[in-house]
C-alpha cells in the first residue's frame, strides 16, 4: 500500500541521490536556488513574504519577490513550506513588472504542479534601464507580494545592469 510517508521517503531518497540537495537545504538557500534560473549574479534587493492559507488555515506558502542583475530578469519565487500542502497541489502564479514609460513592460503567468517541500521559480523579463524604480510582483490566489528596485548606484536598493 502506498502511503504519504512512503511517497515522501521515496522523494527524499531521490532528492539526495540527485546531487545531495535535500528539501531543507533548498528552502534554506533561496539565493542558490534562484541562481539556477536568474543567473549567478543574482542579488536580493528586497523581498515581500505573504503567507497563503486555505480555508482550514493549514496550508501556506511564501512568496519571495526579488531581483536579478543578469539578463534583465526580475524573479518571483514561490516557496511551498510545510507538510500540510500534501503531495501535489495546483499552483497558479501571476507575475508582473512595471516601471517608467520607456521601459519594456510585461507579464508572465504560469501554473504547475509542485511537490511537497519544493519551490517554483518564475521569471519575467524587462529592460532594466531607467531612472525610476522597477516593480515586480507575484500573486497567488488573494495574496500577493512585491518589491521595487533601481538601476545604477546610490543609497536606495538597486539592481545592477549585467556586464
Q: What spans do the regions from the language model cover?
A:
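N-terminal prepro-regions of secreted/extracellular proteins
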Residues: 1-55
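Post-signal peptide N-terminal regions of Sec-secreted extracellular proteins
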Residues: 33-163
